[in-house]
């Protein structure tokens, strides 16, 4: 059973994760969508969720579909107050301005707001991304840019690859993302609509024959990565199956 293989990985307080995840889902489903004549005016898509933070992309339907990025601390998510980059990263204001410098001259009414940040996946890692919104010919547009800072441990507790991304992309040209187990014994490679799991040893993929393949929906995206041991794999497996997930042997 794939979940049982996780027993040898890093310990996590998974009960806290489940509690925070339930809180975030409740917030998104109950408070983040305002209905007017049965039509949503604000949509929120999850980009990342961890033990303490959630990153979303917000679409304001009644404002020409303006799209912004926001990060919330789960402890006070009900306050609807996104955090600023400088709240989580040293010199955050400077790093935001530095990253956006080349695109600040775009269009009209450029909005520079260091709360307009999010977490996304790139080359097997979580990275911080900033966004600038602007108007052009009355159209709401935006440009994204990378922020030269590593997400803090309070946001992403484990984010390592036991196999270098260059080697992964060379062996799997169609691979779009990858996750390594903390004990370095296996790697999950995302290819098209599949999670493919491979054994690894000493920073190399042991065999190109996958241990297992797991189908995922088309255009699905990874928003969370957690590792567990002890009783937590079984707890999470049972909880996910209750929510409609497949039991994978």
Where are the regions a protein language model picked out?
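A broadly tuned "polar low-complexity/structure-edge" signature
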Residues: 3, 52-57, 196-197
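Post-signal peptide N-terminal segment of secreted/secretory-pathway proteins
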Residues: 1-38
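Hydrophobic beta-strand positions in blades of beta-propellers and related beta-sheet-rich domains
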Residues: 15-19, 23-25, 66-72, 194-197
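Acidic, serine/threonine- and glycine-rich low-complexity intrinsically disordered segments
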Residues: 28, 32-174, 180
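Hydrophilic extracytoplasmic domains
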Residues: 145-249
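Generic hydrophobic, helix-prone segments enriched in Leu/Val/Ile
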Residues: 3-7, 46, 128-130, 222
